Amino acid sequence: AFLTMQAGGRPVEIELSREETFAFTRVRHAIDFSLKTAVRPDGRLVARRYEAYSNQGGYASHGHSIAANASNAYRHLYQDEQVLDADTYTVYTNIASGGAMRGYGIPQVNFAMEAHMDDVARAIGMDPIDLRVKNCMRQGYVDPGTGITCYTSGLLGCLDQGKKYIGWDEKRKAYANQTGNVRRGVGMAMFSYKTGVYPISLETASARLVLNQDGTAQLQMGATEIGQGADTVFTQMAAETIGFRDEDIHIVSTQDTDVTPFDTGAYASRQTYVSGMALKKTAKVFRARILNYAQYMLKRAANT
């Protein structure tokens, strides 16, 4: 395709068959988990043991980092009295190679973890929601591995409202003693997901704001808009921080990253949290400089 494009001077489309897609591109990793949990009679988690084998296929790709990200996510949702004991292995096999898919190992580990929590609840005769309420991460929780603090959490309120609107208690009672081949059930699961790649790697982001002569601002971001709505979020964050209207912030979705400030890219759901925070800091400095100059020109305080 590259040579054809060079010869003809026009873009060339590569269209793979379904078989070629699975055989010669990347697939999501299949991960086998072995989970053990020590729990007190009241449902409090004491210690957890985690072992995972990630099927990498024939080539490395994102294998080790996805396996590490899965194990890192396993400890986020629930707190236990002891530090999580975890071993993760990447296994090379002769199937299609695993690569970076949406969720980056976390959907696999969350499925295993939530199925395991249901098993624990059943083993001690406890309501699955009550078990989660007793152990889930709360505001103020400090991750023992990264030192990151959870400053806000609406998880308990979400569980309470979900239980109410789904009719959890009523349905569990109604479905308790069923017979026959076709039965009804009610279940729930929680999901946690982090932004960025820290502590596996460092995060870097930057932004530039230029004041135009008409009183609008040009926003330059190295964080790429790929259809996820990042430019809309950046516009709103800049406008709110500076005090401008949204329409007064101009951003080009196809910015040349050779001109914009450096950013590591669009991945890991990082742009609002990481790139957006860089933008917020920039917007605060931008606003302060405008107000300082206004004070100089008008000979009056900015808050008057």
Which residues fall in each region the model found?
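Structural alpha/beta core scaffold segments of enzyme domains
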Residues: 1-304
